[in-house]
Amino acid sequence: MSSVNQSLFLLLRIALNHSTEECDALRNLSVVDWQRLYELSKRQGLAAIVFDGISAVMVRLNDKSLGMPRQLKLRWLSLLDSIENKYDHQYKVVQKLAQIVTSQNMPSVLFKGVTLSLLYPVPNHRQCGDIDIYALGGRGDSLDKAIVDAGGKLLDVSPKHSELTLGDVMIEGHRYFVQRYFSKRAKWLDNRLVECANNSDTFIEGTKLYAPNVQFDTLFVIYHAANHFKFEGISLRHIVDWCFVVQRANCNISEVAQLGLEHFSAVLCRIGRDCLGFDFPDSICQCDEPTYQRVLNDILGSDLNKSDENVSFFTLLKRKYERFSSRRWVYKLLGDTYWGGIVNSVVAHLVHPLSIFKGSK
């Protein structure tokens, strides 16, 4: 493993409160190494958290620079400020949603981003994307209308979810938690998630906005990561999310086997234990060495920030084909088949034809 990758994991272990190990080696990083560390942290969706680790090391060693170029430190601080501001703005929109669903007596579950951030040592340092919300009782259309009446804009509606904006923040109003028409497994999962959602925890006290219980997150987070891993790859942020969920569940994740994802989970848990310092037992980290190394290398070498927006239709098709064909090896790990994946993809595009024009963002 390169010195930059080793430094990344060291800083993450420190930031996640898992390490008091020696960190003098960070002073030996070159200017080029620091730049690579910054870019790698961004690609992995963990730039703010890595900087938390850097700040802790600076205090521990009483060294305000560690050899990091001043301009790079300023750029990193600027990115940190941007991440915090985006999170804080998104949280205000979440509070607005809480007011909306409460005034309309429309119990709803917030899931993914903001709710997962509360598992982190510094919640507003976990980068979040869209806001994902599910109106209990199948009231997705009513929730869309309530958001629009409150000043939001409805952009699109697909079988799985609508797309809206409120306060310039993208919101996905879910009809389903997963693409339930993909397979029997997906249908079972969506039904199970609805069952879990009906027993959610309060997110904002005194409102009708709820957060998933641990059973929901145990199933949804690993399935969501597996889908990303299948089609485009995942970042270390997916692994940190999963490890915090496993920690919250006290390592009781046996229901993951119902999804056929116990082997994938074991690889992620081992990365969490060996590289990120999570205290997991061998029983949930058992995987063969070649698979472990291949998954780890795939994650460290991925660039999920590459956008498919504003490219031609044929370029988009070409990229989708290249991604799909290059990831044939992952299907066995995910308890799936390559040809089954092709069928599922075709079904998804038939159900929502315009989705073929949408790429990675």
Label the predicted regions:
Residues 1-129, 135-361:
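Conserved NTP-donor binding/palm subdomain of two-metal-ion nucleotidyltransferases/polymerases, i.e.
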